[in-house]
């Protein structure tokens, strides 16, 4: 059996209990060495084969996993964060489907959740934003025309922008062109939940300056929106005047 396992956002103790168990049972581990914390390999058992996929192609990854699975071995494909967000695991699953090999997915803590924890922030504040947009700037991987930064910025919702720390000046321009005010709160979270995590609070207009000042060029998330401000409405969930399935309004 092959298991796609989310490694979590960085700190090794943020992997799920299931993920840690699967790592400890694996006969073969193929991990994304460019981003996964190597401390997670401490979970492996003696004799486990370990492959760093940082320099491997899709075909080479499959060439490791498929024969092992066919031989009855337990294989873990360890991805950073949660595999469903920029994890490139769909193409691997399609290849396994083609080969008739079984697999399961074990979710992980995405870096956008780790960033919120680092910021001590809530993305969905009442009367501020009830939506979170996860997106990226185009690079070597293009972005569909209908998913341009300006289009998303027009909503004024909370935005979390991946894989774009090297384009902060252009990102700032496009966010403002889309509708965010230049003084909209923003933050850069570098290596969320890692020991050397760095949080830089700034504004949309000053993203590039803040990134340059701190020497941030990659492995960072950019968060944008009023959720980083100080004003919001109290949640109805714990309001004494609000009746729920479990509690009658007290006044």
Where are the predicted features?
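Class I SAM-dependent methyltransferase SAM-binding "motif I" and its flanking Rossmann-like core
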Residues: 82-155, 198-201
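Short secondary-structure boundary/capping segments
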Residues: 20, 42, 67, 124-125, ...
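A contiguous loop/helix-start segment that scaffolds small-molecule binding in enzyme catalytic cores
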Residues: 2, 60, 71-75, 131, ...
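Short secondary-structure transition/capping segments
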Residues: 43-44, 63-64, 116-120, 136-137, ...
């Amino acid at each position: 059996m092959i298991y796609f396992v989310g490694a979590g956002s960085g700190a090794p103790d943020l992997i799920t209990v299931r993920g840690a168990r699967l790592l400890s049972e694996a006969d073969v581990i193929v991990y994304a060495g460019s981003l996964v914390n190597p401390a997670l390999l401490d979970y492996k058992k003696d004799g486990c084969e370990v492959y760093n996929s940082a320099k491997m192609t899709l075909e080479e990854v499959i060439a490791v996993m498929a024969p092992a699975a066919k031989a009855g071995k337990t294989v873990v494909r360890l991805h950073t964060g949660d595999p469903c967000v920029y994890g490139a695991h769909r193409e691997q699953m399609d290849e396994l489907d083609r080969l008739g090999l079984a697999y399961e997915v074990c979710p992980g803590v995405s870096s956008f959740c780790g960033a919120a924890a680092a910021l001590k922030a809530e993305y969905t504040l009442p009367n501020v934003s009830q939506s979170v947009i996860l997106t990226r700037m185009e690079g070597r991987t293009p972005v569909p025309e209908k998913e341009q930064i300006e289009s998303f910025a027009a909503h004024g919702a909370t935005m979390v922008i991946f894989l774009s720390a090297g384009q902060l000046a252009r990102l700032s321009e496009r966010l403002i062109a889309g509708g965010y005010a230049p003084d909209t709160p923003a933050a850069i979270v570098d290596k969320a939940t890692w020991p050397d995590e760095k949080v830089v609070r700034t504004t949309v207009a000053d993203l590039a300056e803040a990134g340059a000042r701190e020497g941030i060029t990659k492995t960072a998330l950019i968060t944008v929106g009023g959720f980083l401000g100080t004003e919001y409405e109290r949640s109805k969930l714990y309001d004494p005047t609000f009746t729920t399935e479990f509690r009658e309004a007290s006044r």
